[in-house]
């Protein structure tokens, strides 16, 4: 039958130009300690950026090779609301309302440790924000799609 492969990632921002999570650990949620990674591009949470896009390279701190689906699920669930980039001071409480994840490839076929996350802010108003994300393995192959609605609580 007909088969159409997902478009690969083109020209990802290099890890070497990123800002390591550890550099801003005091401003970030503690669960990020479970991951090694860096923010790339012009936005990161609480940076005051008006960007609608959040990009990062990320991998688990521990070996997840025996848990291929869980490895991708945790990676896909770790990005904060893109809207938090618009704020210049922590903390703005936020919580998931709904989340969906679609695997594009069988998780067992994903062999790398590093993932490139490309998340877009679709809309935000009245305490709700929607975002879409693409999770790529280091080779550039699209692994999964994420869709999330979150509530945020301005003080």
Feature map (PLM): residue ranges:
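Terminal targeting signals and extreme-terminal segments of soluble enzymes
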Residues: 1-155
